[in-house]
Amino acid sequence: MEISFRQTSLKDAERELFFLQSLESENINGFQMKIPKNMKEFEKLLNKFIKDSENPDSGRVPQKVYWVEINEKIIGIVKIREILNENLKKIGGNIGYLVGKDYRNKGYGKKILKDALALFRNHKYIIITCNESNIPSQKVIKDNGGKLIETNNGHCVYKINL
């Protein structure tokens, strides 16, 4: 199962928007993102992703957004935050990931998180969270070495030692 991460850029906006709009009718279960309705809204979101990767607004931390692909087909999204503020220590963590509905329950979530962890080779550990109701995500996190350290207002907070 060969996946690749491609950082956000404006060049593949049409494919990326199509993927996000395929998620609109479902609960994206804690992956905090408003689904754009059209290309104008999406370009605004992409520009925010690009800005947030280098120069986030006050109170926010740098965050890189990657599209997860297999053979140039988007199957998910990963958000990477190398540093955390107090809020992200409770909800969000260092890594956020989303697997498209057609690719769930096939091992992609586990592989996506494993590959995302490799981006943190200079860290001793990462924090990752998910909704208490998201049992599949809890399994993915545990399968990648996650240890539950607390629950907080419906969110599970895990630590993964690297």
Task: Pin down the residues of each PLM region.
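Short coil/turn motifs at secondary-structure junctions
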Residues: I83-N85, D102, S133
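Short aromatic/hydrophobic contact patches that present stacked aromatics
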Residues: S4, G96, I127-T129
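Hydrophobic residues in beta-strands and at strand termini
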Residues: V99, C130, I160-L162
